[in-house]
Amino acid sequence: MQSFSQHGQDAFVYETFFKSKDGQGYFVDVGAYDGVTFSNSLFFERHLGWSGICIEPLPAAFEKLRGSRTAVCLNCAVADRDGKGEFVDVDMPNFGKMYSGLRAEYDQRHVQILNAYMTGARLIEVPLRRLADILDENGVRKIDYLSVDKEGGELKILKSIDLKSYDVRVISVENNYKDAAISDHLLGFGYRLIKTFAGFDELYAK
């Protein structure tokens, strides 16, 4: 079975947690990009028949996403409020627009990287949605695999859902600068850090 994740996260999650799982699973992919490139969720949809939700704010990436996936695809950014927000649309060699993110939550520690490598950037307006509202609208209470890749604001996303009310088994979260607040939050809900991929993509489970 083909792996699609940047560093083999999907294959590791499958082998470690779901290889013997009976029945269909469910994923939520926040920051799904085009649905294929470095995707943490496509493996489960394509090879195992899982259903789920893919969320991507960039209009061009979203058009590719909804053409490549069978999951529910939503064109918005996940935030701690509903409304509209400014989104930094960045072009980077070899990474395309994958360093893009909400302006209000953009990780300023990326700036040095952007100044060195980016070939262009612009501000666009995107819809904002709360993750809890998205889950409730789709009748989702149990998530086998939650993947969060947002270039800043990951902690806000994790705090925006009550992890006591939603049954989330495995969580991948990008933590580029090893912010302790992310691990402290998840450890407080009984999660354990299972593995860190490439020094920045953390995998938690309970």
Task: Describe every region a protein language model picked out.
Residues 1-206:
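Phosphate/nucleotide-binding beta-alpha loop and adjacent structural elements of enzyme active sites
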